[in-house]
Curated annotation (Swiss-Prot):
Monomer. Interacts with and forms tight 1:1 complexes with RNH1. Dimerization of two such complexes may occur. Interaction with RNH1 inhibits this protein. It comes from Saimiri sciureus. Residues 33-43 have a biased composition (Basic and acidic residues). This is Ribonuclease pancreatic. Endonuclease that catalyzes the cleavage of RNA on the 3' side of pyrimidine nucleotides. Acts on single-stranded and double-stranded RNA. It catalyses: an [RNA] containing cytidine + H2O = an [RNA]-3'-cytidine-3'-phosphate + a 5'-hydroxy-ribonucleotide-3'-[RNA]; an [RNA] containing uridine + H2O = an [RNA]-3'-uridine-3'-phosphate + a 5'-hydroxy-ribonucleotide-3'-[RNA].
Length: 156
């Protein structure tokens, strides 16, 4: 009798475990907006002439774990100014999607590019400071940047 009750509850237990296994990983997952901030925002600082800025930041922001991210851009502007780009000039993203926006003014950025011959785990980057318009993909509610698409020179 007790065995029959246990067997009757087994499918319910399996279902609960499956649901928990599906829901639980998403609870700790970084949102696309938070990932954008981690990978691209550095409002507090500017590398000045620090040649190791990219090496330090790429490592500190977890972009050299398991592989060397080939290219990354850090934006040295207040987060609210970068978020405002989502309500500026609409442009087509590199991948053809229609949710990209170009900043109306140029912004202080640092381009980090993997140097030739650099291999994981010894990721080495070239640091280049620039003043460029940025193009970001935006989504969500609130509508915020979730992807850094490009930087472009002032077209005037």
């Amino acid at each position: 009798m007790a065995l029959e009750k246990s067997l009757a509850l087994l499918p319910l237990l399996v279902l609960v475990l499956l649901v928990l296994g599906w829901v639980q990983p998403s609870l700790g997952r970084e949102s696309r907006a938070k990932k954008f901030q981690r990978q691209h925002m550095d409002s507090d600082g500017s590398p000045s002439s620090n040649p190791t800025y990219c090496n330090d930041m790429m490592r500190r922001r977890n972009m050299t774990q398991g592989r060397c991210k080939p290219v990354n851009t850090f934006v040295h502007e207040p987060l609210v100014d970068v978020q405002d780009v989502c309500f500026q000039e609409k442009v087509t993203c590199k991948n053809g999607q229609a949710n990209c926006y170009k900043s109306s003014s140029s912004m202080h950025i640092t381009d980090c590019r993997l140097t030739n011959g650099s291999r994981y785990p010894n990721c080495a980057y070239r640091t280049s400071q620039k003043e460029r318009h940025i193009i970001v993909a935006c989504e969500g509610n609130p509508y915020v940047p979730v992807h850094f698409d490009a930087s472009v020179e002032d077209s005037t």
